[in-house]
């Protein structure tokens, strides 16, 4: 497990290259698909269930790539990108705890969208609480999460599942 409890954008980019937790650790996406600018807090025993929590942020500005293509004359951040960021953070948590392999989203029990991220927004905040960790032949994390834009909760997800696989050839 890493001793660090917060991470910069540079750290997250290093994770995408396999240079943060080690070459065999789960990697974050690179470039435009990395939907996180910083991890403010990560721990292994906090959160509602006492199994870990993560708080992370994404800075919003009108020049972000998705505002140009989603939608013409009606720019809005795709909801699937916020959901993907939540999965990214579950995989990041498992790598932070020392899991090795390739991360894959396995599903989500429930998702609700009650707002949107527009170009004039300033900041998205992700808050995840880990519900369950499985470290057997299959490594898996299950979490509940919310996403806020400028302090207002607009997305919630229950039972986000991410698995870590040493071999993805049959996945």
From Swiss-Prot:
It is found in: Cytoplasm. The active site is at 70. It holds the Pfam family FabA. Signal peptide: none annotated. InterPro entries: FabA, FabA_FabZ, HotDog_dom_sf. It comes from the Bacteria. Pathway: Lipid metabolism; fatty acid biosynthesis. Keywords: Cytoplasm, Fatty acid biosynthesis, Fatty acid metabolism, Isomerase, Lipid biosynthesis, Lipid metabolism, Lyase. Its EC number is 4.2.1.59, 5.3.3.14. The keyword Lipoprotein does not apply. One of its GO terms (biological process) is unsaturated fatty acid biosynthetic process. One of its GO terms (cellular component) is cytoplasm. It catalyses: a (3R)-hydroxyacyl-[ACP] = a (2E)-enoyl-[ACP] + H2O; (3R)-hydroxydecanoyl-[ACP] = (2E)-decenoyl-[ACP] + H2O; (2E)-decenoyl-[ACP] = (3Z)-decenoyl-[ACP]. Its main location: cytoplasm. CDD domains: FabA. Gene3D superfamilies: Hotdog Thioesterase. GO terms for molecular function: (3R)-hydroxyacyl-[acyl-carrier-protein] dehydratase activity; trans-2-decenoyl-acyl-carrier-protein isomerase activity. HAMAP family: FabA. Belongs to the thioester dehydratase family. FabA subfamily. Necessary for the introduction of cis unsaturation into fatty acids. Catalyzes the dehydration of (3R)-3-hydroxydecanoyl-ACP to E-(2)-decenoyl-ACP and then its isomerization to Z-(3)-decenoyl-ACP. Can catalyze the dehydratase reaction for beta-hydroxyacyl-ACPs with saturated chain lengths up to 16:0, being most active on intermediate chain length. Homodimer. This is 3-hydroxydecanoyl-[acyl-carrier-protein] dehydratase.
């Amino acid at each position: 497990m890493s001793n660090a409890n917060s991470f910069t954008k540079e750290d997250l980019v290093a994770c995408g290259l396999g240079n943060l937790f080690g070459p065999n650790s789960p990697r974050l996406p690179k470039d435009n698909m990395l939907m996180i600018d910083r991890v403010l807090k990560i721990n292994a025993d906090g959160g509602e269930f006492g199994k870990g929590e993560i708080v992370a942020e994404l800075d919003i500005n009108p020049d972000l790539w998705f505002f140009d293509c989603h939608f013409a004359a009606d720019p809005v951040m795709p909801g699937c990108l916020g959901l993907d960021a939540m999965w990214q953070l579950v995989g990041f948590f498992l790598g932070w705890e020392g899991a090795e392999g390739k991360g894959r989203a396995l599903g989500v029990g429930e998702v609700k969208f009650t707002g949107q991220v527009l170009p004039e927004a300033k900041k998205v905040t992700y808050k995840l609480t880990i519900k369950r960790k499985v470290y057997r032949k299959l490594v898996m994390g299950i979490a509940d999460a919310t996403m806020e834009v400028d302090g207002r909760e607009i997305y919630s997800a229950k039972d986000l599942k991410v698995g870590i696989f040493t071999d993805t050839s049959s996945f």
